[in-house]
Amino acid sequence: MIEVGEYKVKEGLYYTKDHEWAKVLDDGTVLVGITDYAQKELGDLAYVELPEVGKEVNKGDVLCEIESVKAVSEVYAPVSGEVIEVNEALEDSPELLNEDPYENWIAKLKPSNLDEELKELMDAEAYAKYLESL
């Protein structure tokens, strides 16, 4: 784990400038979640509007919305693909994203252009440097 001030950045993941992370699993699917920075900036989460299973998304499309006591925020797809699973535990317990944003993923995607799109994402070290610049 890399620490940037009060924020944690987990190694082995890919990151976007919008503070989403992507984890490539052994079967080639991708878990998507929000970073520690995102959950701290949002504050206490009240609701996660999970995407529909079967939904096709392009990289950068809105994947879902998260409501906190402060605001409603959109979560963007870090890679293109089909939503094949959602973390239903978040429906009843959105605070799981506050408690451990790296273990509690939002959606699992079957990616359609993974090799190309991963090149456009940051690794943990690059994301940590990006956070330092904010």
From Swiss-Prot:
Keyword annotations from UniProtKB, A to Z: Lipoyl
Cellular component annotations (GO), alphabetically ordered: cytoplasm; glycine cleavage complex
Cofactor: binding details: Binds 1 lipoyl cofactor covalently.
Cross-referenced SUPFAM superfamilies: Single hybrid motif
Cofactor: (R)-lipoate
Domain Lipoyl-binding: 29-110
Coiled-coil annotated spans: none
Any one biological process term the GO annotation gives: glycine decarboxylation via glycine cleavage system
Residues carrying N6-lipoyllysine: K70
Transmembrane segments: none
Matches recorded under HAMAP family: GcvH (MF_00272)
Record note on quaternary structure: The glycine cleavage system is composed of four proteins: P, T, L and H.
Protein family (similarity comment): Belongs to the GcvH family.
Stated role: The glycine cleavage system catalyzes the degradation of glycine. The H protein shuttles the methylamine group of glycine from the P protein to the T protein.
UniProt protein name: Probable glycine cleavage system H protein
